[in-house]
Amino acid sequence: GNVNTQNVTAKTEVDIDAANNITASGNLTSTNANVDLKAKGGSITTNGTVNAHNNVIANANGNINTNGDVTATNGNAVLNSSAGSVTTKKVTAGQAVDIDAQQDITANGNLTSNNGEITLDARSGSITTQGTVNALNNVIANANGDINTIGDVTAANGKAKLNSSTGNVNTGNVTANNDVDIDAANNITASGNLTSTNANVDLKANGGSITTNGTVTAHDDVIANANGDINTNDDVTSTNANVDLNAGGSVTTQNVTADQAVDIDAAQDITANGNLTSTNANVDLDAGGSITTSGEVKAQQNVEYNAKGSITTKGIINSTAGNIHLQTDAAQGDITFGGDVTAEHGNINIDVLQNGNVTDNDNKFTALGDKGAINSGNFKLQIKGAGDVDLHEIYATNNALIDVANGNLTLAKIDGNLVALQLKTEGMQLKVGELIAGTKIIAQGSDIDLNKIQQRLDADGLLTIVPDGAQPDKPIDNLKIGEIITNKGVRFEHLWLNNGSIKVSEGMFHIDKLVVNNVAHFSNKHMKTAVWGAPPQRDGSDSAYWNNIAVNNPAQNLDEWQQEGTNPNKWMYLHFTAQPNIQHSNGALLDLRNYDYVYDQRFTAVDHMLQQLNENKAEEYDINHAPVVAQYFRYDLYDLDEEDSKSEPAKITVEA
């Protein structure tokens, strides 16, 4: 049958057994021992308090409802429903609180274990705790259905483990001295803070998403794995280890900070609305979609962006002692920078593996390192498909390289020991406001406009420039270099172009191999030179040359053309020396201004033509070219005094 009681008080045991139900309308109290309730075939209901000096044990086949507080002062509080649910108010134990139910567990009051652990097990149902769950050691909750902890969950010296095998887990604050471990078959939602004082925070949503609305802080690792999205709407911090966020959907974060690595992987997009910081290791972002970082991204070692969509940065990217690498692999994988990018002792690499533009908002890219090193101080940007590059400023201790398969390149300023700018499709424009280099410049494209070139002040020797067309077997269509300032001089290994102009303000100026199809102008502070491939015209140049483009086309001799040094038997060379008004060239000299010199010295084509028009060749030069300068004087001849010319030859005496 049933047992129905009012108040029951005993110095030792209070022991109530019923074949069916137990209902206690009053208080049940054992001042020095246990309260033991057993309803073999029914339910247990206590409407008053249940107090025991030692243990409170309730076992029922049906439901257990404790509508008053349950206290086991020095022992355990054990509530077990083999076929039903358990519903409680406050439950307090000196040792463990252990609540098992076949169906649901609902705690409408606080659950407290002063010296032990709290275990909640809903084998076929859900768990809901309205109040706090506080244990000296572990807090463990296992449910087949949902777990909802509305009040704070605290495991002062142990771990907090919440596991839903088929449902969701929703929490408030969860704090543990050891691990905070939350597993859900579906979604995890933390409305409060998740804190592990001395271990890890581990979140796993096997079939759903993870959302944290409070902070997530761990002494060691913070690990979140979700089949769906991960949204961390407050700060995530690993004090001494890693933060690892892995989503089958998208990842959205605020600030993420780790002593070691920050590793975020998403099958779709990554959006970091706060800062991403690795104090002693790497920041690694890998997205099957796009990546957007709105805050600062800082790492002691490497920073890596890898996206199957586009990349957008709105804050700075900084690596103290590693490399920075951004890569897209998409039909349209643009990379847009909104902050400076600095590798304090490493390389910067930007790769667009398919198509996409690379642009910034007046930012600076800085790659610093040891001089001559390949592992630091280098900048490299590559677009393998179609896309334009438009960047403000680039500085590299060593090499600064940009390679674009099919697009335009626009730079305000670039500075590197070696600078290589390569556009490999005809019709694209390469435009640079200021280019600073130490030893060498490689410029490739069909339309090249370099406003100002300056050599690094600490550079030794001549600055070497290697210009080429978009294709090696095609000339540059248009080349314009507004000004070149060097420490000693500049040397072009070869130059094949249709049209162009180059001005050197400081230093010597050498072109080892030169082919001009139409017309190009070259000048220093003292002389302006025109070189014609088309029929020449007077244009006010101090010297003018013609090169025969019908012979020795560079396209037919690429190996020889690209070798260093002159090849005077095949191609023209042009050297402006350190001495004013002096050139060395083997070109067909058309015209030369008075008091300018070209070595080896020779008559110009204009001189020859004028001489043929005037039978009095001695007077021709005075009449037609320079009336006040004798022709022979112009060619380094000098006049002998008339008396000297009439004197007797000098005698030579040889003594034996």
Q: Whereabouts are the PLM-identified features?
A:
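Long, low-complexity, polar and repeat-rich extracellular regions
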Residues: 1-656
